[in-house]
Amino acid sequence: MDSEKIAQTLVELRGARPRAEVATALGVSVSALAMYETGDRIPRDETKRKIAQYYEKTVEEIFYA
């Protein structure tokens, strides 16, 4: 699992959506989402599933591609 690649994917998926909007939808703090998007933290499995569902992708597509 390459944290830089995951971070880049998450930023690309979020696009122009405000970080606060996505964080609220996922049930995480804005700072946690920011850490995922900078590669400073990898989300837990449950959060990975929420992220995948939100972006209509699979966990594998986002985190293991």
What do these predicted ranges mean?
Residues 35, 64-65:
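Phosphate-coordinating loops and pocket residues in cytosolic domains that bind phosphorylated ligands
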Residues 16-18, 43-46:
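Residue-level signal for the short linker/turn that defines the boundary of a DNA-recognition helix
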Residues 16-38:
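Short alpha-helical DNA-recognition segment
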Residues 29-32, 44, 58:
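Short coil turns linking two alpha-helices in DNA-binding domains
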Residues 11, 20, 49:
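Active-site phosphate/pyrophosphate- and oxyanion-stabilizing loops and adjacent acidic/basic residues
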Residues 1-16, 60, 64:
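A short, Lys/Arg-rich alpha-helix, primarily the initiator
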Residues 46-61:
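DNA major-groove recognition helix of helix-turn-helix/homeodomain DNA-binding modules
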